[in-house]
Design a protein with these regions (language model features):
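Conserved phosphate- and dinucleotide-binding cores of soluble alpha/beta proteins
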Residues: 2-4, 8-17, 76-245, 249-271, ...
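Long, charge-rich intrinsically disordered regions
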Residues: 278-279
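N-terminal active-site beta-alpha-beta segment that forms phosphate/nucleotide-binding
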Residues: 2-84
Length: 285
């Protein structure tokens, strides 16, 4: 048996999860015989870039300025469908696409929060949940398998099933950026350990998190297994360390919103747009 430890930061963790999923046995059957619907996130965009050289458009994001959306819609897809070896933008026909999916098909998304009980959730900053709001009833009722790709850095304390009702975009009085609610995601969470264990015959454990001097949001991982399998993972880690240090998302969606923006009409409590009802003393640069 062999044991190895390594650290990956932020984007490298996203690349690792994407690479492991792409090469795993759990993903292959859907590529061959089913439909795979991807919802845009930085981690999922790593996966679609590796799969089909097609980065995705991201919508909401947390930046140094708070919870924001993209400044412009951009031309990239926020929802991509992979079927019969081809990938296409289904933003304009999302509901029809979901109506044609069922058991034997796969939905792949990221998450903004996960807990120790296996629950995951997305931040919702617009009325009805935007594109994910369209997806939710189909994910709960049509037997579509859902994979939730997210780093252990998204782990929060407590139980999301209890927290979700307490976080409300409409009850919030002040927010740096748009106030948000949480929407649950029904499905299977794949963080770094689960992704690694699907990629190679190893046991994987996260044993520390943190970072300094450019390595913020790092994760320390230990793997154990036969030498051949451990070195298989280390070879992949070496490749990941040479990949771009920014997530491969659609360039048109990189810029964050500034007041006024296309989403202002739906966003609530944003202090940058003077929508807060308390604390009117922030400095806007």
């Amino acid at each position: 048996m062999a044991i190895a430890q390594f650290t990956l930061w932020g984007v490298q963790c996203q690349w690792l999860i994407a690479r492991c999923v792409l090469d795993s046995s759990l993903f292959a059957p859907y590529l061959s015989h089913g439909k795979v619907l991807f919802k845009g996130s930085s981690t999922v965009s790593c996966l679609t870039t590796l799969l089909a050289d097609t980065p995705m458009r991201i919508c909401g994001r947390i930046t140094k300025n708070g919870m924001k959306r993209g400044k412009a819609e951009g031309q990239g897809a926020h929802f991509l469908l992979y079927e019969h070896g081809e990938i296409r933008n289904v933003d304009s026909c999302l509901e029809q696409t979901l109506q044609a999916m069922g058991p034997g098909d796969l939905f792949v998304t990221g998450a903004n929060a996960l807990d120790a009980f296996g629950h995951a959730a997305l931040l919702i900053g617009s009325s009805g949940g935007g594109g994910y709001g369209t997806c939710m009833p189909f994910l709960y009722t049509e037997g579509i398998r859902t994979l939730i790709l997210t780093s252990v850095m998204k782990l929060i304390p407590g139980d999301l099933t209890r927290l979700n009702p307490q976080i409300s975009r409409k009850k919030c009085d002040f927010s740096y950026g748009m106030s948000c609610s949480l929407a649950p995601i029904p499905g299977e969470v794949l963080t770094e350990p689960q992704a690694l264990e699907s990629y190679a015959h190893v046991s994987a454990r996260v044993f520390a998190k943190g970072g300094f001097s450019g390595a913020e949001a790092s994760v320390a991982i230990q793997i154990e297994g036969e030498r051949k399998e451990v070195e298989k993972v280390l070879n992949m880690v070496e490749q990941i360390k040479s990949l771009p240090t920014e997530p491969p998302v659609d360039e048109g969606s990189l810029a964050e919103c500034t007041y006024p923006c296309a989403g202002c009409s739906q966003h609530r409590s944003c202090a940058y747009a003077n929508k807060q009802t308390i604390f009117h003393s922030i400095k806007i640069s």
